[in-house]
């Protein structure tokens, strides 16, 4: 981690008032920490757009395990991309529905493609990819 540098920011008073309200709502101790988080979030979003860069994330799927061959198709897709999958969690929500969470890490384009293949598989009721950074380039 580098040296901490102080710098000034000029803001419109209405914008500052809204920012202070956001800081209070999210329990930031200081404006500086809120600004650091905003900068980090912007840098992480930039990582997601770089298709060759490694990213991390989770893919959450909800599906009816009674659907013909669905579990087998999902497993085959996962085995095709096993190097992207760190771990999985399978939960029985009720008699019919399952929730599966995959923790993923790899090149952004491959992670997105895997998520798209799984969520678009016939029988999947809902799929949600949530991306984050590997943390390697953040201070």
From Swiss-Prot:
Protein name per its UniProtKB record: Putative nickel-responsive regulator
Gene Ontology terms for molecular function: DNA binding; DNA-binding transcription factor activity; nickel cation binding
Binding site for Ni(2+): 79, 90, 92, 98
Source organism of the structure: Oleidesulfovibrio alaskensis (strain ATCC BAA-1058 / DSM 17464 / G20) (Desulfovibrio alaskensis)
Function: Transcriptional regulator.
Record-linked Pfam families: NikR_C, RHH_1
The entry's keywords: DNA-binding, Metal-binding, Nickel, Transcription, Transcription regulation
InterPro entries cross-referenced by the UniProt entry: Acetolactate_synth/TF_NikR_C (IPR027271), ACT-like_dom_sf (IPR045865), Arc_rbn_hlx_hlx (IPR013321), CopG (IPR002145), CopG/NikR_regulator (IPR050192), Ni_resp_reg_NikR (IPR022988), Ribbon_hlx_hlx (IPR010985), TF_NikR_Ni-bd_C (IPR014864)
NCBIfam families named in the record: PRK00630.1, PRK01002.1, PRK02967.1, PRK04460.1
GO BP, sorted A to Z: response to nickel cation
Cofactor requirement: Ni(2+)
Keyword Transcription regulation (UniProt): yes
Cofactor details (free text): Binds 1 nickel ion per subunit.
HAMAP family attached to this UniProt entry: NikR
Family membership noted in the UniProt record: Belongs to the transcriptional regulatory CopG/NikR family.
């Amino acid at each position: 981690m580098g040296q901490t540098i102080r710098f000034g920011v000029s803001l419109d008073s209405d914008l500052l008032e809204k920012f202070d309200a956001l800081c209070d709502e999210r329990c930031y101790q200081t404006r500086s920490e809120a600004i650091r988080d905003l900068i980090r979030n912007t840098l992480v979003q930039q990582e997601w757009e770089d298709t060759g860069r490694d990213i991390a994330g989770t893919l959450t799927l909800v599906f009816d395990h009674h659907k013909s061959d669905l579990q087998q198709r999902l497993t085959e897709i996962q085995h095709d991309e096993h190097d992207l999958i760190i771990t999985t969690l399978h939960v029985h929500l009720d008699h019919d529905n399952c929730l599966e969470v995959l923790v993923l890490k790899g090149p952004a384009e491959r992670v997105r493609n895997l998520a798209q293949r799984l969520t678009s598989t016939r029988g999947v009721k809902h799929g949600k990819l949530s991306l984050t950074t590997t943390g390697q380039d953040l201070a």
